Amino acid sequence: MKPIVCDKGHGMVQAGFAGDEAPKVVFPCVVGRPRDGLNPNESYVGEEGHANRDILTLKDPMEHGIVNNWDDMEKIWHYTFYNELRVDPEEHPVLLTEAPYNPKANREKMTQIMFESFDVPAMYVSMQSVLYLYSSGRTTGVVLDLGERVSHTVPVYEGYALPHGILRLDLGGRDLTDYLIEIMTERGYTYTTSAEREIVRDIKEKLCYVALDYEQEMEKTTKGWTIDKTYVLPDGQEITIEAERFMCPEVLFQPSVIGKESSGIHEATRNSILKCPVDTRRDMYGNILMTGGTTMLHGIKERMTKELNALVPSSMKVKVVVPPESECSVWIGGSILASLSTFHQMWITKDEYEEHGAAIVHRKCV
């Protein structure tokens, strides 16, 4: 039977069958319960929960990619198999994805639930960054994943993540939105409600760009260069955005402007590569893949390339790639991996689980 590939990222669950070009189902990763609290056992999963959000409290059982509510996570997997894919998990191997720094106890719990609650014949857990690399046709490189709240650099060599080289940055798209709100507030605009926050996020995505040279860009504006853009608010009012367009994304390269002591994304990538074996570094510098919504900012690839070239030996060729953003990239990588003829040797089988217990996941899913 075809393996099932199930990915959870950016608040959505994507599931389908190995070998397919796209997931069969995509739905919100939420469990909703009535706000009145009269029946705490009543719950609505996925689209059902989303459709009734006016009367429900919606919760995602994961935070920063890490499960923190296993009962709800099990409900979501049950809903995925039986309601969305309409299959019996006892008949399909299952490939699940995980974020970097997924705690050991969580990996074991995922394994235990798959075998004990769903009675799957085999399962595997793969890091999302590795699968993202697969989807771009590579098995070696560094994945810089710019998330909403946190970002990660994950070096991968010949299809395996190098754990000692993984770095976490407490820097993400949300910081850029917050900084833009701060700058716009200084100019006399106010953004306090969640609807207003959404407007600022939209301004960021549509009008902001990364300066190739920040100081030079600043100088241009003081010398009368016009980089103004107009944004039409939902009520028809117009606001003009000027130097904020490039000041906002500068946070990625100079987190100190918002008071963060974190490294810039270019330094984190370099530091991540320096933690890898010397003989792998040339391949790493030549395959730097950026992913996440923030990578859509115009100019980010060129600036990243420039900053890295200034940090690394001139003998190293730096190549930064920003593949066309596909919400399904990780899932597609999983579909490719689970359909490889050699992959059947990698699955954790039911027999292995029964013999070694859930800790087998650390040995087989590295």
UniProtKB/Swiss-Prot annotation:
PROSITE patterns: ACTINS_2, ACTINS_ACT_LIKE. It is found in: Cytoplasm, Cytoskeleton. The keyword Nucleotide-binding applies. SMART domains: ACTIN. Gene3D superfamilies: 3.30.420.40, Actin, Chain A, domain 4 (3.90.640.10). Keywords: ATP-binding, Cytoplasm, Cytoskeleton, Nucleotide-binding. One of its GO terms (cellular component) is cytoskeleton. The keyword tRNA-binding does not apply. One of its GO terms (molecular function) is ATP binding. SUPFAM superfamilies: Actin-like ATPase domain. Its main location: cytoplasm. Pfam families: Actin. Polymerization of globular actin (G-actin) leads to a structural filament (F-actin) in the form of a two-stranded helix. The binding of profilin to monomeric G-actin cause the sequestration of actin into profilactin complexes, and prevents the polymerization. Actins are highly conserved proteins that are involved in various types of cell motility and are ubiquitously expressed in all eukaryotic cells. Essential component of cell cytoskeleton; plays an important role in cytoplasmic streaming, cell shape determination, cell division, organelle movement and extension growth. Belongs to the actin family. There are 8 actin genes in A.thaliana. This is Putative actin-9. The lineage of its organism: Eukaryota, Viridiplantae, Streptophyta, Embryophyta, Tracheophyta. The gene is ACT9.
